[in-house]
């Protein structure tokens, strides 16, 4: 019988420093804003907050840290906004820099009244995290009357995945694993694919069948579940509520375009999907008709749909889209005459065009991917990101990148 070594609870819960996010919060230290950490459930918001607290303790003296985690029963008695306010005021220390951290803030009903009141006193540096369905980007301006800054946290990037496993010796194998496992790092604690998949499923189902249903008082979850699965299965396809409602109804899930439109908005508000609008490159204008929707993490697609319709070209396109958003780009789908450019990425004055593919070793596929890029007449960079497994090279002014290399670049 094989000998098994049992480890203590927590031995598998390895953590890494998510430098990009930590540096961003450090930049905001002391600014007169409420710092709000958002992101999908289990994306690492609480871990980021804890890392920042450790940074403060290690680098500053004469500080007072007031930390409240509403998941901890210790704070059960202050899950009422008057009590929360009183607790913070009681723990204020005169003559010190007072930091207030509230984790899972949505568990205190009307928390915004307490936070706004504390903010108005001008004596706390305030940081909060909350569930993705209850601390929505769209709601922040309504909830918080003072100035606020949102720090949006994504699941692990491929670079962070490699950092977690402390290995880039075989980046191709690691990338193959990442495309399936995704970036929800809590799943990495499990030894088997089945257990990892179950973890991801539970996170996803909690968002769809509990968080969103509770937030929006939905009568049932069937349409929402089928819609979400449809969007996963149709990544990279142009989509409209009217078209989706017709397809769902034809497949024994009766609904209408109004409901579909609302539910898509809910899924995007909760950061399950990101909507990418179209941009007319020649006319230099944004288009209102049809959009594309990309899933927050490729691991969710595999956990929910399995290998069904496992089109790696679409999976890679999804990974590239989320990476562009993670790097702070505004992302659009490009339209040029009758052709389509997978992504137009813009950040300040920087702009470039991207085509994403799986295998471009065949001449016909290679020419098909190059064709739309070659028709663009401006001087902005153009690139193809594909599974080449070769160093970067150029063709007719187009940079050809291996996807694993490109993901590790920044």
Predicted regions located by residue number:
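Accessory nucleic acid-recognition modules appended to NTPase machines
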Residues: 66, 193-351
